[in-house]
Amino acid sequence: MTPEVLRQWQELAEQVREHQFRYYVRDAPVITDAEFDELLRRLEALEEQYPELRTPDSPTQLVGGAGFATEFEPVEHLERMLSLDNAFNTEELTAWAGRIHADVGDSAAYLCELKIDGVALSLVYEGGRLTRASTRGDGRTGEDVTLNARTIEDVPERLSHSEDHRMPEVLEVRGEVFFRVADFQALNASLVEEGKAPFANPRNSAAGSLRQKDPAVTARRRLRMICHGLGHTEGFRPATLHQAYLALQAWGLPVSQHTTLVADLAGVQERIDYWGEHRHEVDHEIDGVVVKVDDVALQRRLGSTSRAPRWAIAYKYPPEEAQTKLLDIRVNVGRTGRVTPFAFMTPVKVAGSTVAQATLHNASEVKRKGVLIGDTVVIRKAGDVIPEVLGPVVDLRDGSEREFVMPTTCPECGTPLAPEKEGDADIRCPNTRSCPGQLRERVFHVSSRNALDIEMLGYEAGAALLSARVIGDEGDLFGLTEEELLRTDLFRTKAGDLSANGRRLLANLDKAKAAPLWRVLVALSIRHVGPTAARALATEFGSIDAIVSATTEQLAAVEGVGPTIASAVSEWFTVDWHREIVEKWRAAGVRMADERDDSVPRTLAGVTVVVTGSLPGFSRDEAKEAIVTRGGKAAGSVSKKTSYVVAGDAPGSKYDKAVELGVPILDEDGFRKLLEQGPPAEVGEPT
């Protein structure tokens, strides 16, 4: 081995460890997964050629997070928590299966599981109760994140009883914590709205959310978990992995519904091909298929290396990234005045669709990513996730690139731009009432799916109505007449009559007048008020007038609202032209209060109920609706103000909180009686 080879190994090993630190500890990687995999494979190839380089402390021999100090208390796993080896093509998968065959013959059946792009978590249950949750760490010692894990709805505080599966004395179960795509998008949107940097991808957001110092922050983020393996167990020795999954499910632990048992490598390849085509039909991101030998005895025979089991492998799909030219960086003015830079690029196909634009969030993000106009950039798009510019390909720069300069005046109306308050990352156009860009976005927002969901009132239609001065702002929408629509080319036929689309628009506007109050609140473009907060306000107050009359403190006290949203709502209604929009809509017949169904008895007036666990007779939304329609409040957390907790199968930490505070606990039968008869005289724990 020459000094040059040793130098090359040292450089590669140092790069791998640096990127592992950024990935596992800082949750802020600066290269893509594919680029990291390539670095690791180069290091492995070098060690294959020169085995003396394969020392115990080489990154190829360690689990990803090994050796890094963290801010959480260290905790030892009962059994080592290993990583997985990867296969990137059919040849590597076949070679792995060949090694299995050489060792155990044709007797191995395989489990095929979706490889969720999340963060690994280990749960320990003793006597059926959750006693510890920890991250992977170096495989032997992880970080104690028990308090945060208890806030994840999928993680039961106690295992459920099962007639078919005896509950083990000790159960160490491994799984993946992740964000659903829709929840990830909602989280990033809220971060950007608050002037904070968004997460790069769902995996980073899951890791960052799980490792919050304040469990309340984790609780507000809709993390999910799926269990996919076992560690140490006492009183539980399943013969196969798929039998183990059936037991986990019976005990109330979340397992994937997409796992398939196949007989041979041909079946494995069929699953890999299938999910390669259908990966975006799942509500969370996947980056491959994990293949495992199902027979536990064969697993023990095959054993493991220092970092990964020999009986499992992760087949990884090609990255959903592409390179293209950044032609320009332009800015867009949003409905609340926020000025957002976006990338204008040479169209490129990625993740099954053609991408030509991507948001850059704010000037700070442009600087952080280090992109210049004229750069070749790497973009990423997975399924329905909004396209994202990851960064520049610096080696391809030729000197013609130039920096982006954020404008100082609004590109739509010329008003000087400024942050709303000192320290904000976002800059805004303060001309909120008449800025053409804000007007177009607000009119379009009224028709959006989360607001009043008005078909035929798309971006083009809204712009046409404004440019023809048929409407002055969104307040005029519900007063539109056939004569006014005829003033726009878009809704007029060649014969001068109202087009079919024009008639549909008028009909849809009329239909939208009867929308529930929460949709009206969303449609008003009150900052921070999305469907969740709007539903909470509508449920608590019932009418626009009651919301206007409420103090900021009363608004903030509503579950799911809080002080930031409460202040935004109060401030919005103090603006004269905002109230004019409300009155225009009211005069046009838009419903400003929710109708109460008098046929449903108000048995829960003044009662606050928290539901935890699964109820066979109710979905989560059905249970909440049953409470609200009877005048009660369906809360999301337990406090001294909680009247009752309804505990279904696999209740979470809310059950323990109720016991601690002495809050009455009902089972499903007790819940039904509560709905029918109102509060009973005495309520005990479910039997």
Curated annotation (Swiss-Prot):
It catalyses: NAD(+) + (deoxyribonucleotide)n-3'-hydroxyl + 5'-phospho-(deoxyribonucleotide)m = (deoxyribonucleotide)n+m + AMP + beta-nicotinamide D-nucleotide. Its EC number is 6.5.1.2. Disulfide bonds: none annotated. It comes from the Bacteria. One of its GO terms (biological process) is DNA repair. Belongs to the NAD-dependent DNA ligase family. LigA subfamily. DNA ligase that catalyzes the formation of phosphodiester linkages between 5'-phosphoryl and 3'-hydroxyl groups in double-stranded DNA using NAD as a coenzyme and as the energy source for the reaction. It is essential for DNA replication and repair of damaged DNA. This is DNA ligase.
